[in-house]
Amino acid sequence: MKKEKTERTKQSWRKAQNAPSLSEVNNSVAIPKNAKFFRKLFAFMGPGALIAVGYVDPGNWATSIAGGSEFGYTLLSVILISNILAVLLQSLASKLGIVTGRDLAQASSDHFSKPFGFVLWILAELAIIATDIAEVIGSAIALNLLFGIPLIWGVCITALDIFLVLFLQHKGFRYIEVIVITLMVTILVCFGAEMVMSHPDMQAIAKGFIPQSEIVTNPAMLYIALGILGATVMPHNLYLHSSIVQTRQYARTKEGKKEAIRFSFIDSTFSLTIALLINASILILAAAAFYTTGQHNVAGIEDAYKLLNPTLGSSIASTVFAVALLASGQNSTLTGTLAGQIVMEGFLNIRLKPVVRRLLTRVLAIVPAVIITALYGANGINELLIFSQVILSMQLSFAVIPLVMFTSDKEKMGEFVNPSWLKIISWAVAIFIAILNIYLLFYTITTL
């Protein structure tokens, strides 16, 4: 018995791995040997962009617009803090994948009992469906704003992006990364142009990045601040990142893993900085266009669109805003498909054809969106968008806590285990997020 226990400790995992994560693209992107730093960095760049997509989805837009229109530039510091937390958690996710060769779903399935693993899978699937609902809503609103397509038809049209995803997966993983990066740049350029048109107060922006005591003392401001924090770190991103870092052909040796961890950190930090700039730009735009003109109650994305042209005095302001929204929705679609595949294969060891997997997720997202749109129209759509963010908040801790557990476990991580200082910080962040999301859930239920 003692010998068996010792052997299991050495192995650190209960079962041998059945298949690598995302086996069709695992170890598929070449890394040039003996290349210079920037050439290698370019080869590693890409996964971070796919992760950053989750930080600029329509759910984030709603909280940033509300924060900027109601409280000006004050909540910029909250966006900055959220981004720092995101960098920490995403670095842990990528390290788990690189060191162990398992994604977060595979690691959770091995570590926990079957019943609890099944519960984690259900929660992860709910989070992915909630994310997909936000993508569907964002794309449908953008199609309505740009082309006048009724919301209910816009929701149905979003089903067609399944074929885009399948085509890109067939062409190769690098193609997906290029498309995502292109759309991210589109969003950044759009909001950069909007910011120039809005003539923001640069001194107020600089002050906004310094945390203010009123964020805690003002209940209304605190709620929106918590909403920004709660909607920033997406649970499906942790599963996704731990998998897609393994698409690179780095040497599966001690030195190879060290190098991969270093380049992956640079990649994700750079991409999340772009996401920070986008989210900050949305809040700055809302503050400059609405808060300073006395329009403090901009309720949703459509309201912001309608108010931009008369407020900024430019006929293209609203169009640029809608193009960025469409790019955001389509971008998130690409990553949602991959995340769904990862959690199903990792937790259940069930491998579905990509078309079946994508159809399943999209149908489960479209059905509630169609029903709510048909019954309640645009107001119902905005309520559904908010509800999807609550679902994500509820699930987040069930991804963060296992991630911190595994990366702090020397048996699983070996010499790559989190050092003591990082363990303390990681657990503090995990507990903080858990308390935050419990508060958000309680507040949402009591205000229904």
Curated annotation (Swiss-Prot):
A GO biological process held by the record: iron ion transmembrane transport
TM ranges: 41-61, 69-89, 117-137, 147-167, 176-196, 215-235, 270-290, 307-327, 363-383, 384-404, 424-444
Superkingdom, natural source: Bacteria
UniProt keyword terms in alphabetical order: Cell membrane, Ion transport, Membrane, Symport, Transmembrane, Transmembrane helix, Transport
Annotated localization: Cell membrane
Pfam (any one): Nramp
Gene Ontology MF term list: cadmium ion transmembrane transporter activity; manganese ion transmembrane transporter activity; metal ion binding; symporter activity
Keyword Transport: yes
Protein name: Divalent metal cation transporter MntH
